[in-house]
A protein has these predicted regions:
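A membrane-topology feature that recognizes alpha-helical transmembrane segments
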Residues: 1-152
Length: 152
């Protein structure tokens, strides 16, 4: 495991704990990582986690489109959308589906935990917690979709 994976995992966990404690993801965390992901592309020709530049750009767009309906319906906040877009920039589209899946499972586990131990369920849960922990899990376990990129 390289410093890139460890850095992305630490960044994701930092975002998750911030969203859990304060229910907000600051712009310096989300847009800073998105900017870093975009800055790495012309310098190296690939994203920070090694996917081709086309996968990183597609990852940003796919992350935006995946969470846009939930944002419009006020199920997630703008910080969650930017957090997921930064994950697309740092890891490419290959990591997005596994992160999205893990985030859903983690969020459902939080709901089940609250229902089981307190008997109550919040109206809204910080989705950044699931996204951050899911991203760390995916990055550290090297769980990716095997996509073949003609544009590299």
């Amino acid at each position: 495991m390289g410093w890139e994976e460890m850095g992305v995992a630490l960044w994701a966990v930092w975002g998750a704990q911030g969203d859990y404690r304060r229910q907000r993801l600051p712009n310096r965390l989300t847009l800073g990582a998105l900017s870093l992901g975009l800055a790495v592309l012309p310098l190296t020709g690939h994203c920070l986690l090694g996917a081709p530049w086309s996968a990183a750009l597609l990852g940003i767009a796919a992350a935006f489109l995946a969470l846009l309906p939930a944002y419009v319906w006020r199920l997630v906040a703008a910080g969650d959308v930017k957090f997921f877009m930064a994950m697309g920039a740092l890891g490419g589209v290959d990591v997005l589906f596994p992160v999205y899946l893990a985030a859903g499972v983690i969020t459902l586990a939080l709901v089940a935990r609250d229902r089981l131990f307190t008997g109550m369920v919040q109206r809204q849960y910080p989705y950044g917690v699931g996204l951050g922990l899911g991203c760390a899990l995916v990055v550290l376990s090297h769980w990716r979709l095997a996509l073949h990129w003609p544009l590299s």
